[in-house]
């Protein structure tokens, strides 16, 4: 039996396991086989690659633009940090025109909405508002209380299906924010998730003994995103 959520298997089996992303399962082999393998996962394949800020800029902009091919209203999650601010700025650049027809016609919803969530007075909210004002989004600041956060924890755990403390803590405000976004009719949002894993943005990356260890840790973090940060997203 296979289900997209653990709760869908309740009552049908006595043992459960994860179906890892990038794998397929063949019953005859009784094991998972990895099919998603890219050259860049191996350090030796990338160690001599030249670094190009221009190519990185163009690739990121193209990736964001590609994800704006949407027939439903979309927005951006804007925390005020570097990752989400860059994604929001690129999205705003293309939001007024339909990317499906090479910007020949206006978008059905030309005003880009940005969203930030936090306790009242949180510094992240101040930073998010500054970015929103600068790039020109219709900004929504969602405040919640500690009591509201505590009340939501049971539902959060039900949906993300983990008791991991860090994941639950990060998912709780996201859950409260998602309810507001849904009520506004926004069907899709872009965020800055994954940037720290790709670029080694976490503080402990500074302790990497060499470039090979740094690269291998970024690949490992990317492979585990589905278990942690992508759960909250």
Predicted regions and their residues:
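Glycine-rich active-site loop/lid subdomains used to bind and stabilize high-energy intermediates
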Residues: 29-30, 129-233
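Cysteine-centered catalytic environments shared across enzyme families
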Residues: 1-163, 174
